[in-house]
Amino acid sequence: MNRLKSDQKTKLRQFVQWTQVTEAVSLNFLAKANWNIEYAMTLYFDNPNLFAGSTPQPSVDRSNIERLFNQYVDPKDKVGEKRMGPHGINRLLTDLGYEATDRRVLVLAWKFTAQTQCEFSLDEWVKGMTALQADTVQNLRQRIDSINSGLESDKAKFHELYLFAFNYAKSAACRNLDLETAICCWDVLFGQRSTIMTQWIDFLWAQENAAASRLAQNVGASNAKQFKSVWISRDTWNLFWDFILLSKPDLSDYDDEGAWPVLIDQFVDYCRENLNYPKPGNASNDQQMETPSYY
């Protein structure tokens, strides 16, 4: 340890404190993560026995986990026996210091494999807390903060969270995700909007408003408000990840013959016709747009 730099010693102490494993095991994880402590923590919680000879996960007290769960069960929620509902989860988020629109809230639901928005079953809670090796609110926050930070350097894990968000966010009675909820999820997942993300969302609202206007002519404006015209299918949601991740900022490499969802095809056409994006075979090297931070 004497050969380590000052900042490495600090990271080593933090890793040992958070995971309760030995210094030797901690050094292995930190070295594999090139001393990126967030990525090292993600590696550890995904596979604590990654290195031969590593110690098993420190045990957590199930009774403490259940006791903590019961502190957040609120009779006002009326979500059934042994379930934490919206009131309880709001108190939990307050204790964690998270806003409802914080991506860490979605990470929490993902790590607990939650099936219903704003609810945790006792089973989800116990399995999630045990997997995270947390039995206090403080430990839970440390684990979730670390996993969330690690997403920036672990695209595969970020993709898992992205795919989880579709099922978690949509209504159980619907196959697709309504537009407003989808946009909210994209904002939570990706944060500040890039140019292409802003244009995508503007396009979707334009599609929704145009469809609503046509509908209003047939059924009246008041009746038209009851209907949603643009829905995000699972296929569109899943492939939008590839689209936003792989496409050049000016979409000059977009494959018109590729198996893209219709909505994405329409968006590319919209950009070419209305936003001066280069058309196929006429790509421009001069168009300047920022690359999203989540690339």
Swiss-Prot record:
Presence of keyword Nucleus: yes
Residues in UBA-like domain copies: 8-45
Coiled-coil region list: none
Database matches in Pfam families: Cullin_binding (PF03556), UBA_4 (PF14555)
Location of this chain's protein in the cell: Nucleus
UniProt domain DCUN1: residue ranges: 60-272
GO molecular function annotations of the record: cullin family protein binding; ubiquitin binding; ubiquitin conjugating enzyme binding; ubiquitin-like protein binding
Keyword annotations from UniProtKB, A to Z: Nucleus, Ubl conjugation pathway
GO cellular component: cytoplasm; nucleus; ubiquitin ligase complex
GO biological process: astral microtubule organization; establishment of mitotic spindle localization; protein catabolic process; protein neddylation
Gene3D superfamilies: Cullin, PONY binding domain (1.10.238.200), DNA helicase RuvA subunit, C-terminal domain (1.10.8.10), EF-hand (1.10.238.10)
Function statement: Required for neddylation of cullin components of SCF-type E3 ubiquitin ligase complexes. Neddylation of cullins play an essential role in the regulation of SCF-type complexes activity. Does not act by preventing deneddylation, but rather facilitates neddylation, possibly by acting with rbx-1 to recruit the Nedd8-charged E2 enzyme to the cullin component of SCF-type complexes.
Record text on subunit structure and interactions: Interacts with the cullin cul-3. Interacts with ubiquitin via its UBA-like domain. Interacts with ned-8/nedd8.
UniProt name for this protein: Defective in cullin neddylation protein 1
